[in-house]
């Protein structure tokens, strides 16, 4: 068996197209563009790349992009003041504070300052609570993107056994909550789980988000399982001085056993920004009091 490749790049392009169409419809009804604000503190190179990409994608989707770039030595109080300003701005529907923040800042305090109804990253404790009890709220972009890929591939997930490897607040925990809501039987595992290969081998769905290069081997995978690889790890390439990206799953061996698998790159990665745009647009409709059909996006 050779696994089918789950093309996150193609799915993300389709999702962006739907977002663009609905952004146009929103502007016609609300008399303004949906707006996404991104706040960057410091000059971390990776964060700068992410922020540029998010701003470009926001504009391409037909939404307004607001970028606030602050120096690394910005006082926490000044960052909180920017967040409060964005909370009060009716042109801003979604707020994203790019992480990580400088060490002198309390990330949880900053996230808690964001209006939960503008928290399009889904990191606010209120949105985490809403997810846990099944109420509408914003879900972190990466796990929601994973769920979209799974439902597109498998349809109804009810009754399937799922293992989520990883327990972070950003991916692992919300991923488990989303799968529980789809009536999966969910096990949350991690690097210290006893007999981890045996645990994974029981799963119809494997979501790997543990941050360890190629940790999940092909002989861990149940034949016919669907594998979602969230990992993005840079490892030495074949040529000296070169690097390459790999996931948390040993793709070559897993692809011989699984029925479907996401590649790295080109799998989950493209979904994250596409879902961010989706969340920002949902926020715009809610903030404007305009009904958005649950299956529209």
From Swiss-Prot:
Coiled coil: none
Binding-site residues for NADP(+), renumbered to this chain: 166-168, 191, 232
Domain of life the protein comes from: Bacteria
Molecular function GO terms recorded: methenyltetrahydrofolate cyclohydrolase activity; methylenetetrahydrofolate dehydrogenase (NADP+) activity
GO biological process: L-histidine biosynthetic process; methionine biosynthetic process; purine nucleotide biosynthetic process; tetrahydrofolate interconversion
CDD domains registered for this protein in UniProt: NAD_bind_m-THF_DH_Cyclohyd
Pathway assigned to this chain's UniProt record: One-carbon metabolism; tetrahydrofolate interconversion
A Pfam match: THF_DHG_CYH
Known catalytic reactions: (6R)-5,10-methylene-5,6,7,8-tetrahydrofolate + NADP(+) = (6R)-5,10-methenyltetrahydrofolate + NADPH; (6R)-5,10-methenyltetrahydrofolate + H2O = (6R)-10-formyltetrahydrofolate + H(+)
Record keywords: Amino-acid biosynthesis, Histidine biosynthesis, Hydrolase, Methionine biosynthesis, Multifunctional enzyme, NADP, One-carbon metabolism, Oxidoreductase, Purine biosynthesis
Gene Ontology, cellular component aspect: cytosol
EC number from the UniProt entry: 1.5.1.5, 3.5.4.9
Family: Belongs to the tetrahydrofolate dehydrogenase/cyclohydrolase family.
Subunit: Homodimer.
Function noted in UniProt: Catalyzes the oxidation of 5,10-methylenetetrahydrofolate to 5,10-methenyltetrahydrofolate and then the hydrolysis of 5,10-methenyltetrahydrofolate to 10-formyltetrahydrofolate.
Name of the protein described by the UniProt record: Bifunctional protein FolD
Organism: Novosphingobium aromaticivorans (strain ATCC 700278 / DSM 12444 / CCUG 56034 / CIP 105152 / NBRC 16084 / F199)
């Amino acid at each position: 068996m050779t696994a089918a490749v789950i093309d996150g790049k193609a799915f993300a392009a389709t999702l962006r197209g739907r977002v663009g169409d609905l952004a146009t419809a929103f502007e016609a009804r609300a008399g303004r563009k949906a707006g996404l604000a991104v706040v960057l503190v410091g000059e971390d190179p990776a964060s700068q790349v992410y922020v540029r990409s998010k701003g470009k994608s926001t504009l391409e989707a037909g939404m307004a992009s607001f970028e606030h770039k602050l120096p690394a030595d910005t006082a926490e109080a000044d960052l909180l003041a920017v967040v409060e300003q964005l909370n009060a701005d009716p042109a801003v529907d979604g707020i994203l504070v790019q992480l990580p923040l400088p060490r002198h800042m309390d990330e949880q305090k900053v996230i808690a300052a964001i209006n939960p109804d503008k928290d399009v990253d889904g990191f606010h404790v209120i949105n985490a609570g809403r997810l846990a009890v099944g109420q509408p709220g914003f879900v972190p972009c990466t796990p929601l993107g994973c769920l979209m890929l799974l439902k597109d591939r498998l349809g109804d997930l009810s009754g399937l056994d799922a293992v989520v490897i990883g327990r972070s607040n950003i991916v692992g925990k919300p991923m488990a909550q989303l799968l529980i809501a789809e009536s999966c039987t969910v096990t949350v595992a991690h690097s210290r789980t006893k007999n981890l290969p045996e645990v994974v081998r029981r799963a119809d769905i494997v979501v790997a988000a543990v941050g360890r290069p190629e940790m999940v081997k092909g002989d861990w995978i149940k034949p016919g399982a669907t594998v979602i690889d969230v990992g993005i790890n840079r490892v030495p390439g074949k040529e000296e001085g070169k690097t390459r990206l790999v996931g948390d799953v040993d793709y070559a061996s897993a692809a011989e056993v699984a029925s479907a698998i996401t590649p790295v790159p080109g799998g989950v990665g493209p979904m994250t920004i596409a879902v961010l745009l989706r969340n920002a647009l949902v926020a715009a409709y809610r903030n404007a009091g305009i009904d958005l059909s649950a299956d529209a996006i």
